[in-house]
A protein has these predicted regions:
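Conserved glycine-rich Rossmann-like NAD(P)H-binding loop of the short-chain dehydrogenase/reductase
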Residues: 28-44
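Substrate-binding pocket helix/loop in short-chain dehydrogenase/reductase
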Residues: 95-96, 103-108, 190, 201
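Alpha-helical segment proximal to the catalytic Tyr-Lys
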Residues: 124, 168-172, 229
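Residue(s) in the substrate-gating loop at a strand-loop-helix junction
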Residues: 139
Length: 244
């Protein structure tokens, strides 16, 4: 069991998978600092649900200077970060042949650069304390191509490479780094996916119940926990058998 008051930082924790992660970790005794970008009222409701186990912080993945300040503020106001969940992301579809450079750069910078900057801010502190666990949330598009998601898939595949290399860099000093690939999870982020594509994805799943936000959150909580103390540099797929 995790000791009380262990602190986790969850980016994108006000909705979808991130919200489920924040709730699951709080139930397991973690104190959760979670980030939000646009919807302050939504973040406030999550904080109320978590009670003294939750603290909201505003954060935009695209703000290159903000990650360092965020980590510093969390450690000063909440406590030393023992777990980092890089969950926040930006999805926008576009065919490669017509994708503008700015759109490509934005998706790569937000989805891969944001993870890089959060890791860069948190890792030195974890190394100093010789403990910490990082879970980076990727996507099935990293390993299973989907038309219109070349930039998004490239960024999410980059997260897997970052995860493996960083695990090698920091493992000798007690810090673990893993990734999770969620399958098709019915959240607001994928609300605009065409019904025929949703049907095709769901029909490819081996488990009829599909994937839920709480199911993904449980996998992330496991990787953060002491039960996963011997696991690093790995990718855990939570997809109801879609990629099997």
């Amino acid at each position: 069991m995790n000791p009380p008051r262990r602190v986790a930082l969850v980016t994108g924790g006000s909705r979808g998978i991130g919200r489920a992660v924040a709730s699951t970790l709080a139930e397991q005794g973690w104190t959760v600092a979670f980030t939000w970008r646009e919807r302050e009222e939504e973040a406030r409701r999550v904080a109320e649900e978590l009670g003294d186990r939750g603290r909201p912080f505003r954060f935009d993945l695209r703000d290159r200077a903000r990650a360092g300040d965020l980590v510093r503020e969390v450690e000063e106001q909440v406590g030393p970060i023992a777990g980092l969940v890089n969950n926040a992301g930006v999805r926008r579809d576009g065919l490669l042949a017509t994708l503008a450079d700015d759109a490509w750069d934005d998706l790569i910078d937000a989805n891969l650069g944001g993870v890089f900057r959060c890791c860069r801010a948190a890792v030195p502190r974890m190394l100093h304390r010789r403990q910490g666990s990082i879970v980076n949330v990727s996507s099935m598009t990293a390993v299973h191509g989907l038309g219109g998601q070349a930039a998004y898939g490239a960024a999410k595949a980059g997260i897997l490479g970052l995860t493996r290399s960083l695990a090698r860099e920091v493992g000798s000093r007690g810090v673990r780094v893993n990734a999770v690939i969620p399958g098709f999870v019915p959240t607001e982020m994928v609300a605009d996916v065409p019904p025929d594509r949703v049907k095709a994805l769901r029909s490819a799943e081996a488990l009829p119940a599909g994937v839920t936000t709480t199911g993904v959150a449980g996998a992330i909580a496991f990787l953060l926990s002491d039960a996963a103390a011997s696991i690093t540099g790995q990718t855990l797929v939570v997809d109801a058998g879609l990629l099997a």
